[in-house]
Regions:
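Conserved, single-site charged/polar hotspot
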Residues: 2-382
């Protein structure tokens, strides 16, 4: 299933600071604030919240307890044998330079030298750094070294480099590696490596399980390296603590009825997680809403956005008939994020989803309530 971009834990502090800074700006004399949006959380809210898990870890709970709380009815299991994932790092219309490779396209290479992956029609050619052809590689160039490959302008990565021509005629730059090594490059980008080991281990198991169930089926790759899948930045982003969390849980995944569980997670739930069905329309027994008491540690556990009447009507223009008069929330989820609402405009009534409202307003989540207040001078906080 293709999921929307998901904010990371590290993005929270920056966004919260920006919101406060914007609120401190002087308002235009013409702007009259008369709508206040009160909200909770950051992201879709399905599955484990990083800040909630952090709080449980601070209160002495182990990673198995944390996972069991957020993914109801699952159990810990172990994958058998090596599992390889393929992660799209970037796409390039130019040649891809790389080094530290000892072989590519059935050709022995010097790891101290730089080589190129060059597109020729729908195939890839291995070339020297000077552009001299070395070998025709067919549909995919695969370059491997002694455990690490250096891709110019991208970074150092465990495993191998694979380049594949995509539908747009560009080269997909893909990192193929074991799922355990992949998780080492994910954990510190989804949870601060200074957090307690129990939270990092919970993140390791959740990230490993997610990686093995959330393949997107792209041109030569399974996963994105950003929030469309999980944030993955390779070897240079690794930390000792997060590596330890991966190694001490190596191969562990969450299971449900004999299958690896699809362990969605988000940064901040707002105090209650949400069910998969209410957010993505698919019912999954272990992805249901649960209380998240320690999410209060999150900078965006609660937030407020303020809009003038003209401003909110402009933002909702594609959903609203006329100028906004009233918002009626008609259906909510467990959390309670908005599932459905009615917008009363001067030209009529329209029905929208919470996700439509979130996108239109640029809010942090779809857990929102709307308050119409007396007009006064103020600035938009978003």
């Amino acid at each position: 299933m293709s999921l929307p971009r998901r904010p990371t834990t590290f993005a929270l502090a920056l966004l919260a600071a920006l919101a406060c800074a914007c609120g401190a700006l002087a308002a235009s004399a013409r702007a009259q604030v008369n709508w206040v949006v009160h909200g909770h959380g950051f992201g879709h809210g399905v599955g484990m919240s990083a800040y909630g898990a952090y709080g449980y870890a601070l209160h002495g709970k182990g990673y198995k307890f944390i996972l069991g709380h957020y993914y109801k009815g699952t159990s810990l299991g172990t994958i058998s044998g090596p599992s390889t994932v393929r992660v799209l790092l970037t796409s390039s219309s130019e040649d891809v330079d790389f080094s530290l490779a000892t072989s590519a396209c059935k050709t022995q290479l010097n790891p101290a030298r730089i080589y190129q992956a060059h597109r020729l029609g729908n195939t890839v050619v291995l070339r020297s750094s000077a552009g001299k052809p070395i070998a025709r590689c067919g549909a995919t160039l695969r370059a491997a070294g002694n455990g690490v490959i250096d891709i110019a302008g991208v970074g150092k990565y465990r495993g191998a480099l694979e380049t594949v021509v995509n539908e747009s005629g560009e080269l997909n730059v893909v990192n193929a590696l074991s799922v355990n090594n992949y998780v080492k490059g994910v954990i510190p980008n989804e949870s601060p490596p200074s957090w307690p080991m129990a939270e990092l281990k919970a993140q390791a198991v959740a990230s490993r399980s997610f990686a093995l169930t959330a393949g997107v089926g792209g041109d030569g790759f399974d996963l994105y390296s950003d929030t469309r899948s999980q944030v993955y930045k390779g070897l240079e982003s690794e930390y000792t603590t997060s590596d330890q969390a991966e190694e001490e849980t190596a191969g562990q995944v969450l299971m449900y009825e004999g299958q690896i569980a699809e362990t969605l997670f988000s940064a901040c739930s707002g105090g209650k997680t949400e069910s998969m069905k209410n957010v993505f329309g698919v019912s999954i027994p272990y992805l249901v809403g649960v209380p998240d008491p320690y999410d209060s540690l999150c900078p965006l556990h609660t937030w407020t956005l303020t809009f003038s009447g003209p401003e909110i009507s402009e933002k909702l223009a594609g959903l609203l008939d006329g100028r906004l008069k009233k918002v009626e929330i008609t259906k909510t989820g467990y959390s309670p994020r908005i599932i459905e609402a009615k917008l009363y405009g001067t030209g009529g009534v329209t029905t929208v989803t919470g996700q439509q409202l979130e996108e239109a307003l640029g809010s942090y989540s779809d857990w929102m309530t709307f308050e119409k207040v007396a007009a006064k001078e103020a600035a938009s906080t978003k």
